Structure formats: structure tokens, C-alpha cells
């Protein structure tokens, strides 16, 4: 039934003819004046009329589709030719305000498929820019968009500058996941690239010859994030930071709220109780002051203290892949 369309009443004289659209006989048919028909309307007794089998051709040909749309609009402005089965899906997309090369799509476990010839990423290609995300959905996939000339720009970049960029923590070792949440990172500390990435940079020919390339997206998950400045002894916390799944660091330059010291990356941890490892617990004593239902509303925050609203509805976090 995808090849047919039902309209609330007939298109042609007698509400029963099956004259194909576009034939010369169509112009000769005239519908009777509605004022002359004093009886009950025919379309109330008949559920609808099936457009002939040549109707799908009007969906392919733009001229014929416009002709069919004009015919339907003359009968009822609210009618539109629905000749194809709707197979669409609503997705939320947010583009980076600075560089629109990273797009965040709320597709859940599914990701946005790319039909372009540059699905994979070259080992020498620079890392994508930061994106903007909000805690609206649980898991999201990332897909990158390229511009014309990006390949030339990536070739023009020198090697040391590329190595100085923060590496994406997609393939972290198990040591990072088991680190103590109380251990904090120095402001100038950077992570070294993993051996797999180093090997792929040293042997670009083997990586290009592999039929299966590494996907250019990574899943994100919300975790509890906190900041600690050792210079001014200031600690402030925030929650539901979107980081790469399986890691505990977010690559976004953060400034201290007191001394404006910058450090990157900052550490995050799971949004759960450190005593019983549950999202909702009833432990009499907690290691930190945090409401697990509203982890951003706490004394150490300062952004939403003594406020009537929850910060979980008004803020978003950035990350660098």
C-alpha cells in the first residue's frame, strides 16, 4: 500500500474513474458544480479513492510531483501527496559554535551513518574540534563532518604541533579507570598517546591498507566531575559531565573560578555513592556532600546555591575529542 495514496474524496467526475494522471483525457474531465449536487456527498459514503498505479512516478519526477501537488491543493490546501512510507526519525543535533566539524547526534546506541568516501580518518589527520552537548539524553554518538580543503590543511600542519594536541582518550588502559577519584592532575600534565596510536602513526601504509578502519565516532556517558585548584586551595564541583565512554577524563580547558588558572584535562568519576557504589543509596555517611538525584546542587558549587532552579536544566558542557 506504499504505492498508493488515499484522499478524502475523489479527484475526478463520478468519484470513481481511474484516469491516469498526465494523460490528455485528464484536461477534458470537469467536476460538476457543488451547488448543483443537492444530495448527500458521495465521499461520506465511500471511504476514499486509490490513486492509480502510475502515481509513484509523480514522486520521482519533480515536475509531475508539483503537478499532483497543485491538483491536491486546489481541492484542499491541507492535502499533500504522501506517496512514500515515512521512514524518518527525529534527532537532536548541536554544532560547535567555533568550528562546525564535530556534530553531536542524539541517536542513542545507533549512530549517524556516513555515505561519504572519507568515512575513515587518516592517522596524520588532526583531531576534531570541540563540540557542545547537553544532558538531554543518555548516550550519544559523534560523527565528524569535513569541509573542502581539510585534507590540504591537515597535510600542511607540522608533526610537533600535531603531537602537542590532546589525544582522544578512546583507548585508555585499565589503569586510568581504576585510579583513585581523590587523585588530582596537575595543570600542565598531558596524556601520552597509547601504543596503538603510536604504531598507526609510524606505519601509515599498513593502516591505510586495512579494510576495517576505526569508526569516527565515540559514545558518551555522563559522569560526576569536580575541579580542584592547588594554588588557591579552591575546590568546586559539577556533575553530569559528558565524557567518552570507558574513561574518566574530559578534555576541555577549565579555568579556576578564583585565580583563573587553566588546566586540562580534568577528572571525572561515576555518578554513584563511593561507599555502596549505587546511584540511589541510603548510607548514613557519605564521603562527599552530594545529592545523587541532583548532584550539581551542593554547597561546593556556588552556581546554584540558594537558587530556585536546578542547574541540570540550564547548562551544558563542552568536550574536546
Swiss-Prot record:
Location(s) in or outside the cell: Cytoplasm, Cytoplasmic ribonucleoprotein granule
Listed Basic and acidic residues bias regions: 145-154
Entry-linked SMART domains: zf-3CxxC (SM01328)
Pfam short name (any one): Zn_ribbon_3CxxC
Keywords attached to this entry: Cytoplasm, Developmental protein, Differentiation, Metal-binding, Oogenesis, RNA-binding, Zinc, Zinc-finger
Superkingdom of source: Eukaryota
Keyword Amino-acid biosynthesis set for record: no
Zinc finger extent (3CxxC-type): 222-307
Sections of the chain in a coiled coil: none
InterPro entries: Zar1 (IPR026775), ZAR1/RTP1-5-like_Znf-3CxxC (IPR027377)
Renumbered residue ranges of the record's region Disordered: 110-214
GO BP annotations listed: negative regulation of translation; oocyte maturation; translation
GO molecular function annotation: mRNA 3'-UTR binding; zinc ion binding
Gene Ontology cellular component terms for the protein in this record: cytoplasm; cytoplasmic ribonucleoprotein granule; intracellular membraneless organelle
Family to which the UniProt record says this protein belongs: Belongs to the ZAR1 family.
Comment, domains: Disordered region at the N-terminus undergoes liquid-liquid phase separation (LLPS) for the formation of membraneless compartments that store maternal mRNAs in oocytes. The 3CxxC-type mediates binding to the 3'-UTR of mRNAs.
Complex and partners: Interacts with YBX2.
Stated name of the protein: Protein ZAR1-like
Natural source organism: Homo sapiens (Human)
